[in-house]
Each structure stands twice: as C-alpha cells, then as structure tokens.
Amino acid sequence: MMNVAVTATPSSLLYSPLLLPSQGPNRRMQWKRNGKRRLGTKVAVSGVITAGFELKPPPYPLDALEPHMSRETLDYHWGKHHKTYVENLNKQILGTDLDALSLEEVVLLSYNKGNMLPAFNNAAQAWNHEFFWESIQPGGGGKPTGELLRLIERDFGSFEEFLERFKSAAASNFGSGWTWLAYKANRLDVANAVNPLPKEEDKKLVIVKTPNAVNPLVWDYSPLLTIDTWEHAYYLDFENRRAEYINTFMEKLVSWETVSTRLESAIARAVQREQEGTETEDEENPDDEVPEVYLDSDIDVSEVD
C-alpha cells in the first residue's frame, strides 16, 4: 500500500492561481508558475466571469465503439455521469480561488494531502473521464510497439504478463475506482518516502489501483492508460460481468498509439525536470542537509507488485 501526497498547504497555494506541480531539487513537491492554462477556461457571459470547464466530447462518434461499447452506454456514461461531474465542479468552484485554475491544478490542490476539499471528487472524476475516453478508440486493442512495448517487456516480463496483471488488478479493485498504467519517475514508495532526483531504476511502468476518484497525478506519477471500474462504465452492456468488460476493453478498445504518445511526454517531462534539478541541487541541497519527506495521506492507494 502507498500513502503519499503533496507537501504544500492549500492556504499558501490558493492565492497563486497559476501554479503547477514540479518535482524540484529540494526533494519535495514544489510549485512553479506557468502562464498557460491547460484544459480549463473562463467564459464571459453578459459581463459576468464564470467558471467555464466544458464537457469535452469523446474523440469519436458516440456509436463508433460498437459492438464493444454501445451508444447507449456512452449516452449515459459521457452524456449524464461525466456531464454531471463537470456541472457540479463548475458550481463548486465558482467565485473561489480555484476557478482561475486548469482542471489538473484543481485536482492537485483540492486533493490537499489526502484531506480532500469539496471540489476534489468532481474535479478528479472530470479529469479521469476525459482521460478515459481518450484512452480508447474504434478498432483499438492489439499490441503496442516501440518504446512502450520495450518498457512493458522490461518491467513486466512480457506483454502477455502485463495484460494478465492489469486485468487482475482491474477485476480485484473492490467497489468503485480506476486501474491505471502509469510512468513512475520518482522514488515514492512505502519504505522510502524521500523523493530525491530519481535513479535510473526508479523510472518504470507501474500498475496502480485507486479508489473512487483518486488518480496517480496526486503523487506525481504520469498516467498513461486507465480503465473505469465504476459500475456505470459497463453495466448496461455487461451487467455484473466486470471481467468480460475488462477483457473487451483491453483486447478491442485500448488506443496504444495514444498510450505511446503519453509515454513520450512523460519521459520528456522526467528528463527536463531532472536536468533542472541537477543544475541547482548542489546550491539548494548541501550534502549535510536532511532531506524533506512527503506527509502521509489518509487515502490508501495500491501499487500492484
């Protein structure tokens, strides 16, 4: 089990509307300014500024995943559940310090070291669902290629072994939640909460199970793939046959091209952050300085061995 979270306090962050998380050389989660707002926008209506997260449609027609995922499922899952998360989030953050932030920033700040603020569930579910829709495609499935396949074979033994472990994790994720393939480029684990610059062996693919709305962003992993194991994701098509839904998802729907693109971005991000950290590590962290550690979270998150 893994209990991790960001160290910064919400009171110091909510008044800095353009802050993004970055693993800096001072061995803890830092926050840096970024002038671009990703995912979230503000919309002017009749001269009044309102929170304006929009319900982004899946990148394909709603019937394009048939017969593996029905139009009816997407009508309910995207058109009702996902939509409700976005609408509720906009209501929750309107007029607060959070309504100037991107969706990812709202997720990270409202997680609040595991003591989630009211906006967290809707923000994370909105983010998770958008990521989920973009993880699948008509005619998906098959087998990845290139660097993604190489890392899967390195970290799991074989693609077939990865499939079995991912399916098992998703099937055994009790209740509502998500199962993820993520790129881990830090040293957060149960035995070592210290987070210095990662060594090469720390950079690896991991399978993670999270409950409810929690996702790997909150402890600074890079999500690559997710499957929604809330019942509303599959019940219309598969009833209580979760294992059949998981098999169909992995064999007929996964967009390995998208996962590969995400991996490229995750690796580039890790390299950039390591370079930035190396440049200032000696200055900010003399050898005799005691490294800071992450605080424990109240939320249990499972990383699959």
Curated annotation (Swiss-Prot):
SUPFAM superfamilies xrefs: Fe,Mn superoxide dismutase (SOD), C-terminal domain (SSF54719), Fe,Mn superoxide dismutase (SOD), N-terminal domain (SSF46609)
Functional note: Destroys superoxide anion radicals which are normally produced within the cells and which are toxic to biological systems. Plays important role in chloroplast development, particularly in the maintenance of thylakoids membranes. Seems to act as a heterodimer with FSD3.
Primary localization class, coarse: plastid
GO molecular function term, any single one: superoxide dismutase activity
Known catalytic reactions: 2 superoxide + 2 H(+) = H2O2 + O2
Activity regulation information from UniProt: Activated by cpn20/cpn21 (in vitro).
GO cellular component, one term: chloroplast
Sequence segments annotated as region (Disordered): 270-305
Family label: Belongs to the iron/manganese superoxide dismutase family.
Keyword Cell cycle part of the UniProt annotation: no
Upregulation: By UV-B treatment. Induced by salt stress.
Full protein name: Superoxide dismutase [Fe] 2, chloroplastic
Location in the cell: Plastid, Chloroplast thylakoid
Enzyme class: oxidoreductase
Keywords: Chloroplast, Iron, Metal-binding, Oxidoreductase, Plastid, Repeat, Thylakoid, Transit peptide
Transit peptide: 1-46
Subunit structure: Heterodimer with FSD3. Interacts with MRL7 and PRDA1.
E.C. number: 1.15.1.1
Cofactor note (record): Binds 1 Fe cation per subunit.
Disruption phenotype: Pale green phenotype. Abnormal plastids, highly vacuolated and without internal membrane structures like thylakoids.
